[in-house]
A protein has these predicted regions:
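A structural signal for short, well-ordered beta-strand segments and their strand-loop junctions
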Residues: 3-5, 50, 105
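Phosphoinositide-binding peripheral membrane targeting modules
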Residues: 15-29
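Surface-exposed extracellular loop regions of Gram-negative outer-membrane beta-barrel proteins
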Residues: 3-18
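Beta-sheet repeat architectures centered on beta-propellers
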Residues: 11, 23, 32-36, 43, ...
């Protein structure tokens, strides 16, 4: 399957017969009419996490078997209990699989927010990482030797001025 996100909805493209998708056997179906924002969605083990079209809500598009035995894709609001963290729009979202399942979010007001998301254990926990005099510009996850590494572009106020540089946040067991 191929998924297409627009500001008007989330679409699923699939072949009508077995094999590969071609112009002759292509089907396109609207899955939800939520709509996405301009930042790139991320793939997690359970679905596609994206920012809703107005820029301040995090959603997951995932396949579900519903109570009435119907099947299909639905979109769950992951940030419903953390709306106060996203008063300004979300700029970037990335996924760090190891050592923990964490979505990292940078907002347009230069804040860094983490979302520990372990769906099979029903864990949805937001945490902020915003020391004073610190502005987060961007974030990336890069595979490391043992774990995924979280890299940030950050400005810190030092000696009377902001200095911008790259930092890697490393997980170490206690």
């Amino acid at each position: 399957d191929l998924f297409i996100g627009t500001n008007g909805g989330e679409w699923r493209c699939f072949q009508s017969e077995s094999g590969v998708i071609t112009p002759e056997n292509l089907n396109i179906e609207l899955q939800t009419s939520i709509g996405g924002y301009k930042c790139k969605p991320v793939i997690t083990p359970h679905g596609i996490v994206f920012v809703q079209k107005h820029g301040a809500t995090i959603r997951e598009l995932a396949y579900n078997v519903l109570a009435n035995s119907t099947e299909g894709y639905s979109s769950e609001n992951l940030s419903i209990l953390a709306e106060h963290l996203f008063e300004n729009n979300i700029k970037r979202i990335v996924y760090q699989a190891e050592p923990y399942s964490i979505l990292w979010i940078v907002t347009e007001d230069f804040k860094l927010v983490g979302l520990t998301y372990i769906k099979e254990h029903e864990i949805i926990a937001f945490h902020t990482h915003n020391p004073s005099n610190t502005l987060y510009h961007d974030v990336a996850v890069i595979p490391g030797f043992l774990n995924d590494e979280l890299w940030v572009t950050v400005s810190r106020y030092l000696d009377g001025q902001y200095k911008t540089h790259q930092e890697v946040l490393v997980w170490r067991p206690l």
